[in-house]
Swiss-Prot record:
Catalytic activity, reaction form: alpha-D-glucosamine 1-phosphate = D-glucosamine 6-phosphate
Protein name (Swiss-Prot/TrEMBL): Phosphoglucosamine mutase
Active site: S102 (phosphoserine intermediate)
EC class name: isomerase
One Pfam family from the record: PGM_PMM_IV
Alphabetized GO MF terms: magnesium ion binding; phosphoglucosamine mutase activity; phosphomannomutase activity
Family: Belongs to the phosphohexose mutase family.
Protein's organism: Baumannia cicadellinicola subsp. Homalodisca coagulata
Top-level division of the source organism's lineage: Bacteria
GO biological process: carbohydrate metabolic process; peptidoglycan biosynthetic process; UDP-N-acetylglucosamine biosynthetic process
Matches recorded under PROSITE patterns: PGM_PMM (PS00710)
Cellular component terms per the entry's GO annotation: cytosol
InterPro entries on file: A-D-PHexomutase_a/b/a-I (IPR005844), A-D-PHexomutase_a/b/a-I/II/III (IPR016055), A-D-PHexomutase_a/b/a-II (IPR005845), A-D-PHexomutase_a/b/a-III (IPR005846), A-D-PHexomutase_C (IPR005843), A-D-PHexomutase_C_sf (IPR036900), A-D-PHexomutase_CS (IPR016066), Alpha-D-phosphohexomutase_SF (IPR005841)
């Protein structure tokens, strides 16, 4: 398969103003996507975005490109990414587009596409779009230009959908929940859903100004959430990322609960209810503790490449209904076709109520191995992963771990960084080896 030039593991992403996230490129991208999607019978595209200031500009030029190819666009305004997956299906649109850079800073943005089934578009469609990008933009005749419309009740539709995944027989009455919406797409929706289900909600990170998305808040920085949970004597804290497709939790003692622990809680609860189909899909980054804890329950576990699209592909291949990344992307195919932070949070809250247990106690049966993750920003186009220095450092680290741990070093599919992950039984050893490899990467980049 031909290597893609622009599309990464989660669409196209970059710094606004730098290629490819420029008005000129996004206009051409809209036209190219329109040409490809039109060949598949498309005539209506749903477009959503998060709260970045650049979203308004990119939304306009993206629509102009689509319209020039003869496709009409339906705008939702700021809304979580999983809402677009849901709306694309329910409104019978031929595709959905989200303008977002997920957990990245405000100065980044991106474009990702959803198919008519509400899943990420396949590689073949992305390659077809890239092929059109190399051609001259030719506008359709005036009578065939695409139009624009808006969905005024998009948020209400998604709120009703999320609430519908929560059993009517239980309530969140008596639970105090602190939510950190990262000044992003969930800032109105998540607090309202929790309140309507009976919880007492304390909301932070809900004052987006276009430039504070993910800034010292949300899944990338849970310190404020931890502090507020303790200060409010809350039962639980929930942090979303900028576009709402991932979620991290904090228990009543202020301890972080990551994606591995979250998926363990959900899988065990489904098993206890007799609703678990197959097993759980994780990634190469999933903690060994998750695998061993699921094994003790008799729940199968398999790993796939890092990226929620690969998790979903493996779920569809096996017929399993639960998959997740430890970063907090949780896919529950019984409810939605992509990672959905709000729905994943509701499933954990449901487990708390069903078992009459705190989040802290629900995590007691999963013992995570010490894991150290270091991100190294690349300053050149040279790939340090082929460096003999880095290769040697990895071999030394593997010998030190002596088959009692794992090393994973890879280039991010969404950012220009190298991720170094070391996992083992001894926390000090894990930290030392991760720093050792990271230093080798820095010296080689």
């Amino acid at each position: 398969m031909k290597k893609k030039r622009y599309f990464g593991t989660d669409g196209i992403r970059g710094k606004v103003g730098d290629n490819p996230i420029t008005p000129e490129f996004i206009l051409k991208l809209g036209w190219a996507a329109g040409k490809v999607l039109a060949r598949h019978g498309s005539n209506k595209i749903i477009i959503g975005k998060d709260t970045r200031i650049s979203g308004y500009m990119l939304e306009s030029v993206l629509h102009a490109g689509l319209a020039s190819a003869g496709l009409s666009a339906v705008f939702t305004g700021p809304i979580p990414t999983p809402a677009i997956a849901y709306l694309t299906k329910t409104l019978r649109a031929e595709a959905g587009i989200v303008i977002s850079a997920s957990h990245n800073p405000f100065y980044d943005n991106g474009i990702k596409f959803f198919s008519i089934e509400g899943t990420k578009i396949p590689d073949a469609i992305e390659q077809a779009i890239e092929a059109e990008l190399g051609k001259k933009l030719i506008c359709v005749a005036s009578a065939k230009l695409g139009r624009i419309s808006r969905i005024d009740d998009a948020a209400k539709r998604y709120i009703a959908f999320c609430k519908g995944t929560f059993s009517e027989s239980i309530s969140l009455n008596g639970l105090k929940v602190v939510v950190d919406c990262a000044n992003g797409a969930t800032y109105q929706i998540a607090p309202n859903i929790l309140r309507e289900l009976g919880a007492k909600v304390v909301a932070i990170g809900c004052q987006p100004d276009g430039m504070n998305i993910n800034k010292d808040c949300g899944t990338t920085d849970i310190r404020k959430l931890q502090h507020r949970v303790l200060a409010e004597n809350a039962n639980i804290g929930i942090a979303y990322d900028g576009d709402g497709d991932r979620m991290i939790m904090v228990d009543h003692l202020g301890y972080k609960v990551d994606g591995d622990q979250i998926i363990y809680i959900i899988a065990r609860d489904k098993m206890q209810q007799g609703k678990l189909v197959g097993g759980v899909v994780g990634t190469l980054m999933s903690n060994m503790g998750l695998e061993l804890s699921l094994k003790r329950l008799g729940i199968p576990f398999i790993r796939t490449s890092v990226g929620d699209r690969y998790v979903l592909n493996k779920m569809q291949e096996t017929g399993w209904r639960i998959g997740a990344e430890n970063s907090g992307h949780v896919i529950l195919l019984d409810h939605n076709t992509t990672g959905d932070g709000i729905i994943a949070g509701l499933q954990v809250l449901s487990a708390m109520v069903n078992n009459s247990m705190t989040l802290h106690n629900l995590c007691r049966d999963i013992q995570l191995f010490p894991q150290k993750l270091i991100n190294i920003c690349l300053t050149s186009k040279y790939n340090p992963l082929i460096s003999t220095t880095v290769i040697h450092a990895c071999k030394v680290a593997e010998q030190e771990l002596a088959k009692h741990g794992r090393i994973l070093i890879r280039k991010s599919g969404t950012e220009n960084i190298i991720r170094v992950m070391v996992e083992g039984k001894d926390e000090n050893q894990v930290t030392d080896l991760a720093n050792y490899i990271a230093d080798a990467v820095k010296a080689s980049s």
